[in-house]
Amino acid sequence: LGAGNRGSVYAGYAKKYPDCMKIVGVADKNQFRLKSMAEDHDVPEENRFTDWKEALNKTKFADAVIISLPDNLHYDPCMKALSMGYHILLEKPIAPTEKECTDIRDLAIKKNAIVGVCHVLRYAPYFIALKQIIDSGDIGQLISIQHLEPIQYAHMAHSYVRGNWHNSKETTPIILAKSCHD
């Protein structure tokens, strides 16, 4: 659900590792992104949707759902997909409120479903190297870490001034979008 930047990155894994994963459906309100991803992954017409609700109103047709929608749209599709028996790969943050997060957790437990949260920085070379240094003990016993993630101008202007996160009422505040990284 969602064929934008993140959804395309995760779908790219299916292209690289076709024995591990196959994209069998796509939902995106943007016709260009929908068509592009659907054609790239040979998704049949009956599994192309312009809304996540359309996709989840269809009888279950996959093992898992990737939810890479805007932050404020994580809860409802996640709860619906879990109730249908899907496993979930969920873009961070899980949801905007603590209650929504615990609802997702509780339903996943009830349905014995996996909800994997995409903490993408965990796999960035910088953080891998930092963890190796800490784990090696070369710098002694760690007492505290203070980390600043500078947001480059182009990313800030694109995402937080003009882009998807320009208005906290429409998505989530920048502190939630950025501070939920691992």
Locations of the language-model features?
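N-terminal Rossmann-like dinucleotide-binding module
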Residues: 1-42
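Short loop/turn motifs at secondary-structure junctions
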Residues: 20-22, 42-44, 61, 138-141
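Short, Asp-centered acidic motifs that coordinate Mg2+ and/or phosphate
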Residues: 25, 64, 144
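Residues that line or immediately flank small-molecule/substrate-binding pockets and catalytic motifs
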Residues: 28-30, 52, 69, 146-149
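Beta-loop-alpha module in the N-terminal Rossmann-like domain of NAD(P)-dependent dehydrogenases
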Residues: 43-107
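Rossmann-fold dehydrogenase core element
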Residues: 103-120, 140-145
